[in-house]
Amino acid sequence: MTLLVTNIKELLQVREQNILKVSGSEMKELPTIKNAWLLIENDKIADFGTMKNMPKITADQTIDATGKIVLPTWCDSHTHIVYAGNREQEFADRINGLSYEEIANRGGGILNSVKTLQDTSEEEVYEQSAKRLKEVMKLGTGAVEIKSGYGLTEKAELKMLRVIKKLRENYDLPVKSTFLGAHAIPKEYKNDPDAYMDLVINEILPKVAKEGLAEYIDIFCEKGYFSIKDTHRLLSAAKEHGLKPKIHVNQFNSIGGVKVGVEHEALSVDHLEVMNDEDIEVLKGTRTMPVALPSCSLFLSIPYTPARKILDAELPLALATDFNPGSTPSGNMNLVVSLACIKMKMTPEEAINAATINGAYAMDLSETHGSITKGKMANFMITKEIPSFTFLPYAFGTNSIDSVYINGKLI
């Protein structure tokens, strides 16, 4: 099956095969081809170029993209798409003045979702989660990471991870799985959090690894949740089981989470709303990808990740949604890209790089996804007729996506 897209107004994120991420000042550059064509063979990108120099090609299907822009699908490297129910009451509570911490102390927050998840069948959790996955795919997401973390018992955590596995089996986009048993301390362990860490490390983690249910390990390294000591313990144990770290750090406080992530060669450190100079220095020269989650900052009215500080230090940066029922009930990467420009002062070029090639890197996918590169998977989207790619983040409330292709097939 061959698909030819012609008369493309601008083809974005055109890269050579050896580019796996972009950092600092490199992120200001977004390689493009104007008045372009793109050839897909089966599920991969076969060739591309300018219309002026297009050879004679016989394709099974041809699409005229006059006035439209083509770019890789978004790579969302941090989500909690698998959950049950919603938490709209807490949304109202926050409007009425309660903080994230106060809601958690009243039995809301993560523990609210935990109870709902535990009480919901695996089949129902799958059905609810599949709807969300289909929704974000229609919005242009072509690769996604999904975490557990609303189970907090062996049975419920394994249930979540099996749902993630089923989503991966039933949908064509890459679905990466992360074990986040250390998301919050269950009520029954409130007075003995070390015992809960023992459960996660000694009981649940070995079963997750044995069943091959996760590629990554995560922990909410934050005051009131899990300490630096806890993080060291868990990441050390996970390494023995072959799970790479991708961890929550610096959402509300800088307590050394970035440093411990780097020490354990984390693939990514995520959130980073609170960053000091030491955190920036620790990341220099490492392979760890900083990941910002601006729609979480929007929803919770908390600071935004200091993107300019990160990029001016010549570090890379990825963008993701943090899609979850409590702090970001949205998986819209288009909004994330807009917020990065509006609230984090990233240029459109920087934001698109962060949401494509760098997002792919933060999931170990940039060799196969995240750019228009010969031989990569044909995960791309075609916009509606728009004046330029800057219109994507500029028109923040408009759905400018016309069609989305995963593995060369229209979804």
Curated annotation (Swiss-Prot):
GO terms for cellular component: cytoplasm. Signal peptide: none annotated. Pathway: Amino-acid degradation; L-histidine degradation into L-glutamate; N-formimidoyl-L-glutamate from L-histidine: step 3/3. It comes from the Bacteria. Fe(3+) binds at residues 78, 80, 248, 322. Zn(2+) binds at residues 78, 80, 248, 322. 4-imidazolone-5-propanoate binds at residues 87, 150, 183, 251, 327. Gene3D superfamilies: Metal-dependent hydrolases (3.20.20.140), Urease, subunit C, domain 1 (2.30.40.10). Catalyzes the hydrolytic cleavage of the carbon-nitrogen bond in imidazolone-5-propanoate to yield N-formimidoyl-L-glutamate. It is the third step in the universal histidine degradation pathway. NCBIfam families: hutI (TIGR01224). This is Imidazolonepropionase.
